[in-house]
Amino acid sequence: MAPKKTTKKGGPKKRPSAEKRILTAQKRNLINQSFKSKAKTMMKKFEAALKAGDQTSISSGLQLVYSVADKAVKRGVFKSNKAARIKARATLRANAKV
């Protein structure tokens, strides 16, 4: 492990704000990517439930899609219009199967 950089007074060396913003953006990007992947997985599970035709799995899958889409908006991963589109399409597909 590399030695820690310190200032003349012995405290930790301060990072320029641009460098810090790059690091935080990279961290957020990883978190957002994992959440997007989770959302896609839930949508695929919902599609599988639609193909199976089981009513209970369709309704629970639809609830999961709604939940994940709303959480993504709350976290800032999706814009609200994208979540609305996802939920509307899922509802249309679920109603078509009923």
From Swiss-Prot:
Q: Which domain of life is it from?
A: Bacteria
Q: Which InterPro entries match?
A: Ribosomal_bS20, Ribosomal_bS20_sf
* Region named Disordered: 1-21
Question: A single Gene Ontology molecular function, please?
Answer: structural constituent of ribosome
- Residue spans with biased composition (Basic residues)? 1-15
Q: What does this protein do?
A: Binds directly to 16S ribosomal RNA.
| Family according to the record | Belongs to the bacterial ribosomal protein bS20 family.
PANTHER family, A to Z: 30S RIBOSOMAL PROTEIN S20, SMALL RIBOSOMAL SUBUNIT PROTEIN BS20C
User: What's the protein name?
Assistant: Small ribosomal subunit protein bS20
Q: Which gene encodes it?
A: rpsT
